């Protein structure tokens, strides 16, 4: 007798193209997929068994949807997310990647700091600026050409 060892109900927090690929793979394994995003008809919602439209930055909305849907596993796939809720929820529901990893990857500064300062991985020169004058100052230190990116985007 073959048993299904995969989670029965997977919740995707973020339903973009990457979420759609995860949903397709999960459904092939016999999982029930709940696709969540801030807008209706996101790519993964088109093939999911169930979908929820919500503001995933809102702690209460996110908790309510998770509580009502009762997933076996939660997969965060979006940067704009109430990570503190994941920290609380992962005590009861499996979250992959976990809340700490999700928090680190949400912001480029956390990723850079982890790689450069904690893991001692060589990186390109980098700095953070909150306004134009700070940017000008850091640009002179780092040198040109340089690449400017927002710390967080989704």
Predicted feature descriptions by range:
Residues 1-110, 133:
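ATP-binding N-terminal substructure of ATP-dependent carboxylate-amine bond-forming enzymes
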Residues 12, 107-154:
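Active-site nucleotide/adenylate-binding loops and adjacent lid/helix of ATP-dependent enzymes
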